[in-house]
């Protein structure tokens, strides 16, 4: 179980939770059985209207925190994690989502890895669990594009200005977190994990980012509606050239389908040699998608995910343009989005 606060936790695990009754129990079961390091667990109940608070309170070693009213210009998550950090007593802070499940011993290993890498921020991209057509088709495409846009090797390189992190698993030293102002420094950002990594790296601290399927797994979305809302919030911020990327995805999809049709017609005609030539484009597309750590069946479905990815990119871009983005039952617009844009301009300058 989690080490009591009185014993001096090395790590404070902070979980913001808003209506997470479907996943919080599994998350806490995986965290309360961690071994090898003193730690505490704090769940910040961000105005849940379901059984989230009751589930958290059912774990004796878990502290449940109320973040208080949402200040003007703040996002709900940033307010919640700031409240958690204020109550935390650890030398390290692990911000993790309620829909994550942590491998046995992963907490101690993560802190050891951060120290071995001399990193003040360690972030893992979890193994993504996907079910059903929409998740299996769309998620591999998005994560392949993320791997291209934000290569972990460059983010972990102190000589590179590129920086990003995944808020599903973000371990940061208390020293670095407090030095840059914590989440209060990115209070208005809807992409707080990336923004926090940028300001921490810009302040001279080292970050390490990698695929972390050996440490943590998650299922981000459980319906197409959740998937659409979540990526609408994120994609335009992750990919500033969202319109161009959407057009390219549609072109790639059209090229793949055309090549498959030509290949099929040649096979029917008995011309296998030229049919194989037309399969080069679909093969290269699937191999690119395969960099995202999904199953081969999901990578193949990713071909059908290309136009859906384009739709989500355009929807995200339009939502930010009109100033209305919703997440977890809250509508963000006007000052919050404008402030987030200004924050992002200030931190992106000089980054590729």
Regions found by a protein language model. Give the residues of each.
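Acidic helix N-cap motif at the loop->helix transition within catalytic regions
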Residues: 22-26, 50-58, 105
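Membrane-embedded multi-pass helical conduit in multi-pass membrane proteins
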Residues: 252-322
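Long helical/loop segments within the catalytic core of UDP-sugar-dependent glycosyltransferases
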Residues: 66-86, 109, 113-179, 235, ...
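A conserved acidic beta->alpha catalytic loop
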Residues: 30, 45-54, 69
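Acidic donor-binding/catalytic loop of UDP-sugar-dependent glycosyltransferases
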Residues: 51, 98-113
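Cell-envelope/extracellular polymer assembly enzymes that use nucleotide-activated donors
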Residues: 9-12, 40
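Short, acidic, metal-binding catalytic loop of nucleotide-sugar glycosyltransferases
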Residues: 29-38
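Catalytic donor/gating beta->alpha subdomain of glycosyltransferases that bind UDP-sugars
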Residues: 114, 121-147, 175-178, 183-245, ...
């Amino acid at each position: 179980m989690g080490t009591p606060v009185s014993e001096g936790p090395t790590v404070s695990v902070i979980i913001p939770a808003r209506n997470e009754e479907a996943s919080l129990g599994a998350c806490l079961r995986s965290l309360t059985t961690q071994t090898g390091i003193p730690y505490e667990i704090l769940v910040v109940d961000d105005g849940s209207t379901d059984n989230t608070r009751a589930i958290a309170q059912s774990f004796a070693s878990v502290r449940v925190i109320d973040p208080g009213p949402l200040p003007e210009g703040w996002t709900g998550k940033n307010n919640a994690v700031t409240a958690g950090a204020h109550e935390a007593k650890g030398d390290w802070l692990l911000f993790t989502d309620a829909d994550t499940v942590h491998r046995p011993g992963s907490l101690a290993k993560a802190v050891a890895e951060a120290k071995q890498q001399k990193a003040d921020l360690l972030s893992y991209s979890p193994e993504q669990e996907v079910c059903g057509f929409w998740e299996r088709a769309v998620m591999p495409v998005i994560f392949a594009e993320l791997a291209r846009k934000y290569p972990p090797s460059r983010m972990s390189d102190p000589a590179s200005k590129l920086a990003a992190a995944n808020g599903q698993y973000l371990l940061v030293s208390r020293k670095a977190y407090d030095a840059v102002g914590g989440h209060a420094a990115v209070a208005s950002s809807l992409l707080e994990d990336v923004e926090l990594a940028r300001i921490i790296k810009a302040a001279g601290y080292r970050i390490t980012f990698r695929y972390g399927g050996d440490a943590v797994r998650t299922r981000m979305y459980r319906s197409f509606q959740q998937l659409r809302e979540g990526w609408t919030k994120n994609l335009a911020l992750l990919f500033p050239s969202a319109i161009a990327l959407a057009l390219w995805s549609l072109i790639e999809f059209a090229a793949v389908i055309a090549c498959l049709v030509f290949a099929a017609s040649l096979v029917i005609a008995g011309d296998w040699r030229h049919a194989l030539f037309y399969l080069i484009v679909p093969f290269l597309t699937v191999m690119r998608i395969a960099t995202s750590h999904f199953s081969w069946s999901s990578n193949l479905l990713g071909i059908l995910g290309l136009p859906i990815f384009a739709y989500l990119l355009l929807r995200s871009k339009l939502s930010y343009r009109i100033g209305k983005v919703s997440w977890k039952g809250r509508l963000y617009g006007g000052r919050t989005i404008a402030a987030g844009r200004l924050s992002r301009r200030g931190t992106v300058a000089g980054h590729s």
